[in-house]
Amino acid sequence: MTKNIVDLFLLDIIENHYNDIVYKSTASQFYKQFIHFCNLHEFNIMPIQTFGILVKQYKSIYYHRLRNRYFTVIIQH
């Protein structure tokens, strides 16, 4: 379930154009956004250490999708 929450969070970033969070935020700002996401969806909040490990795993999976969406948004503006 913990992995699924991080998966949903990163998919939410991709779908809702929150790319600045990934590329321009510090780790603690990114974690604050995750806490906000968990509170919105009533998920339990995991410790930042666990979050960091899972995000490293998932960011490699979604990196190209995030990057492509990010540059597409910049070009459109």
Segment roles from a protein language model:
Residues 1-4:
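Phosphate-handling catalytic cores of nucleic-acid transaction enzymes
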Residues 7-77:
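Positively charged interface segments
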